[in-house]
């Protein structure tokens, strides 16, 4: 024990600066000094090191616990997302079938509507043709009637003399008088 104490005492007596020497005494060298320093450090630092390690252990355990909770939440969300995906796929398939059926219905409705529009257009065309024919027939009749009237007037004017003209007027006047008497 005396050597250990001597080694500590010798620490107080360092050689002066600028000199360097090699100490070959095993008891006075570094391995013993180091073991003492390490012993003191272990004895006094054990509590601090245990506290540090316990804190680190708690943080690691908390991190693991949080990770497990997050993992559980993520698995739960994944299952919910998968269920929603299945539901959406089912609805999409049903929607696709309904849309196909509705598209076919719309196509048939459009075909029927187009056919009806074509029928209406054909009827309108036929009505327009009939109207134009009636108008043309009416115009022809008016022209024929006007020409007949002109011809009759020309014939009457060429055949009528004053005497015939006066007799016609007198006959018409008598006719009107008799009509007037009948109405009174």
Curated annotation (Swiss-Prot):
InterPro entries: ATP_synth_b/b'su_bac/chlpt. The chain crosses the membrane at residues 27-49. Keywords: ATP synthesis, CF(0), Chloroplast, Hydrogen ion transport, Ion transport, Membrane, Plastid, Thylakoid, Transmembrane, Transmembrane helix, Transport. It is a single-pass membrane protein. GO terms for cellular component: chloroplast thylakoid membrane; proton-transporting ATP synthase complex. GO terms for molecular function: proton-transporting ATP synthase activity, rotational mechanism. In plastids the F-type ATPase is also known as CF(1)CF(0). F(1)F(0) ATP synthase produces ATP from ADP in the presence of a proton or sodium gradient. F-type ATPases consist of two structural domains, F(1) containing the extramembraneous catalytic core and F(0) containing the membrane proton channel, linked together by a central stalk and a peripheral stalk. During catalysis, ATP synthesis in the catalytic domain of F(1) is coupled via a rotary mechanism of the central stalk subunits to proton translocation. This is ATP synthase subunit b, chloroplastic. It comes from Pelargonium hortorum.
